[in-house]
């Protein structure tokens, strides 16, 4: 009898579990994966090239659109690289605000990951709960920047503006009656810090709810335990970072190992896995949400007691105040020049990396002394993770490929750039 050849299957890019535009060419022996070949580039938008034609400030909104689930963390690495080259000091209050919003972004990302991952595996309920909490955090974004997703809130030298004293209120509509609106607005009567503090008090209970639904769930464990195992040595060799590396038992977190902003003043722990499988990575990310909540609490407490500027006083970089612009012609000219021509950055190069929710997100900038970068290179955390997909999926079933894609927490905006 003739030998049966392996079967080739196209997975995605229209597949609901492909998380955007992933195309996988799977080589199968029956239902067992022999090879997984990811095809990328379907969401390529030439961000690195576009940044060469725009001033440093005009490229900030492009950063939001890279990993469009962790918006402010992308901006953070970019503005840190600019600040390194300009050698400017960021006010302490702005550093605390950045750290607080980095952690809000981390929770936003992990909630999206948890909901989507559980949905891919077949658990519908967690998805709905996770999005309930995401709404509150999106409102924090909206309060400081006016946008629920693409905030462009971090600026070279600080942040766009200080935290507001009021929260946006829900208005009565056709789909919600007055009673529902008053319930929604109940915790929005104070400042943004009051709202965030209220959220941090409620959030640990929500995380317990997710764990009740999943952690000891027999089906969840059958789908995740022992799937996509990566040894610590292989994880480091393949360039894994973030939860993908910590899930394999390597204690590496830039917030502790190479502290930036005020992370060295924060009290938090790094969760680390032992087996390097999908289940350990799930546990690591769930614990990360609890640790992020701890950091946010510390930031809220400090910000309540310490006022101060949120933008550097270096006026080559910082725009004039809105009040000054309305009364002073020089301020108006300064504002116009800053946002049209931009500031010139000294010749040199800088690399800045942050502990992004998905791993190490780095921005490498080269300046030739002009008002726009000569070259920008983005180090996307998801890129090496996707590269390791072939090794992680080998020998598993087709259904497990969905679990492995889910555990990698892949977003194509940053991979294709």
UniProtKB/Swiss-Prot annotation:
GO cellular component terms attached to this protein's record: plasma membrane
Assembly information from the UniProt record: NDH-1 is composed of 14 different subunits. Subunits NuoB, C, D, E, F, and G constitute the peripheral sector of the complex.
Catalytic activity, reaction form: a quinone + NADH + 5 H(+)(in) = a quinol + NAD(+) + 4 H(+)(out)
Entry's family note: Belongs to the complex I 49 kDa subunit family.
UniProt-listed Pfam families: Complex1_49kDa (PF00346)
Record-linked InterPro entries: NADH_Q_OxRdtase_suD, NADH_UbQ_OxRdtase_49kDa_CS, NDH1_su_D/H, NiFe-Hase_large
Gene3D superfamilies, alphabetized: Cytochrome-c3 Hydrogenase, chain B
Listed PANTHER family: NADH DEHYDROGENASE [UBIQUINONE] IRON-SULFUR PROTEIN 2, MITOCHONDRIAL (PTHR11993:SF10), NADH-UBIQUINONE OXIDOREDUCTASE 49 KDA SUBUNIT (PTHR11993)
Localization (cell): Cell inner membrane
Stated name of the protein: NADH-quinone oxidoreductase subunit D
Superkingdom per UniProt: Bacteria
Record membrane topology: Peripheral membrane protein
SUPFAM superfamilies recorded: HydB/Nqo4-like (SSF56762)
Keyword terms of this UniProt record: Cell inner membrane, Cell membrane, Membrane, NAD, Quinone, Translocase, Transport, Ubiquinone
GO molecular function: NAD binding; NADH:ubiquinone reductase (non-electrogenic) activity; quinone binding
EC numbers on record: 7.1.1.-
Database matches in PROSITE patterns: COMPLEX1_49K
Functional note: NDH-1 shuttles electrons from NADH, via FMN and iron-sulfur (Fe-S) centers, to quinones in the respiratory chain. The immediate electron acceptor for the enzyme in this species is believed to be ubiquinone. Couples the redox reaction to proton translocation (for every two electrons transferred, four hydrogen ions are translocated across the cytoplasmic membrane), and thus conserves the redox energy in a proton gradient.
């Amino acid at each position: 009898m003739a030998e049966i050849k392996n079967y080739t299957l196209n997975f995605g890019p229209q597949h609901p579990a492909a998380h955007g535009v992933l195309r996988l060419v799977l080589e199968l022996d029956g239902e067992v994966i022999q090879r997984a070949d990811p095809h990328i580039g379907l969401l390529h938008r030439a961000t690195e090239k576009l940044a060469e034609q725009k001033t440093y400030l005009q490229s900030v909104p492009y950063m939001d659109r890279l990993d469009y689930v962790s918006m402010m963390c992308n901006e953070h690495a970019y503005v840190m690289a600019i600040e390194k080259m300009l050698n400017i000091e960021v006010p302490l209050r702005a550093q605390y605000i950045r750290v607080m919003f980095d952690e809000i972004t981390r929770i936003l990302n992990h909630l999206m990951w948890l909901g989507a991952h559980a949905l891919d595996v077949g658990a519908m309920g967690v998805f709905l709960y996770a999005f309930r909490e995401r709404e509150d955090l999106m409102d924090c974004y909206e309060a400081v920047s006016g946008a629920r997703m693409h905030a462009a809130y971090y600026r070279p030298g600080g942040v766009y503006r200080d935290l507001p004293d009021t929260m946006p209120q829900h208005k009565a509509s056709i789909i919600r009656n007055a009673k529902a609106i008053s319930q929604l607005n109940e915790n929005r009567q104070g400042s943004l810090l009051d709202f965030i503090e209220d959220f941090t008090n409620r959030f640990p209970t929500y995380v317990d709810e997710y764990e009740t639904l999943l952690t000891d769930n027999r089906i969840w464990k059958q789908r995740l335990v022992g799937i996509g195992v990566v040894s610590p040595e292989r994880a480091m060799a393949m360039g894994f970072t973030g939860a993908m590396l910590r899930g394999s038992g390597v204690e590496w977190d830039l917030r502790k190992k190479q502290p930036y902003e005020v992370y060295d003043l924060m009290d938090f722990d790094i969760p680390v896995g032992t087996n390097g499988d999908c289940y350990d990575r799930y546990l690591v990310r769930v614990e990360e949400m609890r640790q992020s909540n701890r950091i946010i609490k510390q930031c809220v407490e400090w910000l309540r007691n310490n006022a101060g500027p949120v933008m550097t006083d270096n006026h080559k970089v910082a725009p004039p105040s809105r009040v000054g612009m309305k009364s002073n012609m020089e301020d108006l000219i300064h504002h116009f020049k800053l946002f049209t021509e931009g500031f010139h950055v000294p010749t040199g190069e800088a690399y800045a990396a942050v502990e992004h929710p998905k791993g190490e997100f780095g921005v490498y900038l080269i300046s030739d002394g002009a008002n726009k970068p000569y070259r920008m290179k983005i180090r996307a955390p998801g890129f090496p993770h996707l590269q390791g997909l072939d090794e992680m999926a080998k020998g598993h079933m087709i259904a497990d490929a969905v679990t492995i894609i889910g555990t990698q927490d892949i977003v194509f905006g940053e991979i294709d750039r």
